[in-house]
């Protein structure tokens, strides 16, 4: 029997700064409730989640401040570009994330927006704790040292 192909993920938006500003301790995948024009705009590859975060709104978890531009072909039926979007998670997952943000000083940040192999828009969420300035500098030093070490090993070998 042939091995299963790895699921394809077409990444639309990537929040690379989140791993710099936060120590990500847990990640999970969530669906996102979108309108038709938002899906069309995402399929065009345009979205920004650099300033986005997830937080509670009533009993749901919402994605705030994520920018999905208007779809150019839809004239008067377009969506609001920075509206709060509902995240589709199980109740137990929502309660866990809300509890962590309220008690322990954690933040839920979106790491990626992508389309899965079934064509559904998904958000990869990270539960992270903010880094101090000295932690960020330490991470940069460690990354530079790893790069230099790899370069030295490559030149010797």
Swiss-Prot record:
GO terms for cellular component: cytosol. InterPro entries: SmpB (IPR023620), SsrA-bd_prot (IPR000037), SsrA-bd_prot_CS (IPR020081). Gene3D superfamilies: 2.40.280.10. Residues 132-157 have a biased composition (Basic and acidic residues). GO terms for molecular function: RNA binding. It holds the Pfam family SmpB. One of its GO terms (biological process) is trans-translation. Coiled coil: none annotated. The keyword Ubl conjugation does not apply. Keywords: Cytoplasm, RNA-binding. Its main location: cytoplasm. Residues 126-157 are annotated as: Disordered. It is found in: Cytoplasm. Required for rescue of stalled ribosomes mediated by trans-translation. Binds to transfer-messenger RNA (tmRNA), required for stable association of tmRNA with ribosomes. tmRNA and SmpB together mimic tRNA shape, replacing the anticodon stem-loop with SmpB. tmRNA is encoded by the ssrA gene; the 2 termini fold to resemble tRNA(Ala) and it encodes a 'tag peptide', a short internal open reading frame. During trans-translation Ala-aminoacylated tmRNA acts like a tRNA, entering the A-site of stalled ribosomes, displacing the stalled mRNA. Belongs to the SmpB family. NCBIfam families: PRK05422.1, smpB. This is SsrA-binding protein. The gene is smpB.
């Amino acid at each position: 029997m042939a091995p299963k192909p790895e699921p394809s993920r077409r990444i639309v938006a990537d929040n690379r700064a989140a791993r710099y500003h936060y120590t990500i301790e847990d990640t999970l995948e969530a669906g996102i409730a979108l309108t038709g024009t938002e899906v069309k705009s995402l399929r065009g590859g345009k979205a920004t989640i650099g300033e986005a975060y997830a937080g509670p709104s009533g009993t749901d978890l919402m994605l705030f401040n994520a920018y999905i531009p208007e779809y150019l072909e839809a004239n008067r039926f377009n969506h609001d570009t920075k509206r709060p979007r509902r995240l589709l998670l199980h109740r137990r997952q929502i309660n866990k994330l809300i509890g962590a943000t309220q008690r322990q000083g954690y933040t839920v940040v979106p790491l990626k927006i992508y389309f899965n192999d079934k064509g559904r828009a998904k958000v990869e969420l990270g539960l992270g704790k903010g880094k101090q300035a000295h932690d960020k500098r330490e991470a940069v030093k460690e990354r530079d040292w790893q790069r230099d070490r790899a370069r030295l090993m490559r030149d010797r070998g």
